[in-house]
């Protein structure tokens, strides 16, 4: 950076006054100040853009690292689940089949032998079609009452009067 002290600035001002003259010096100083301000704004914009790009690059790398870690965790979980499912199928097949060891050596999954059954396929029963009326009858009465559109609205005072015991009611007077 330039080392401009007060004495050097004064020397530059005197030289500019001599060269430009007192009439044009204020106009040139104003123009120089405007150009200097524009240059500073441009430099600040470039600095901000560079810092934003650096932050975005850091965020991108963090995002890729996070996604990679998530994929690794997901793969680990799936591998563990597959291993446990294989163990369960082997235990199930050894318990179901009379031989035991022959069924446990067979591969699992869709390529398995047609006689071999998975614990998952036996445990899940086929979905039965429910009757519409039975399904509607299952809805609780309190829920129907709470969600029903009210056709008769009663004020709070009328509700209190309706539930007040007869012994506490005032006698109704007409005229």
Swiss-Prot record:
Cell compartments where the protein resides: Cell inner membrane
Any one GO BP annotation for this protein: protein transport by the Tat complex
Presence of the UniProt keyword Transmembrane in the record: yes
Any Pfam family matching the protein: TatA_B_E
Basic residues bias (residue ranges): 160-175
Domain of life: Bacteria
Annotated segments matching region Disordered: 96-115, 153-175
Gene3D superfamilies linked: 1.20.5.3310
UniProt family annotation: Belongs to the TatB family.
Subunit relationships: The Tat system comprises two distinct complexes: a TatABC complex, containing multiple copies of TatA, TatB and TatC subunits, and a separate TatA complex, containing only TatA subunits. Substrates initially bind to the TatABC complex, which probably triggers association of the separate TatA complex to form the active translocon.
Protein name, per record: Sec-independent protein translocase protein TatB
Organism from which the protein derives: Burkholderia mallei (strain ATCC 23344)
UniProt gene name: tatB
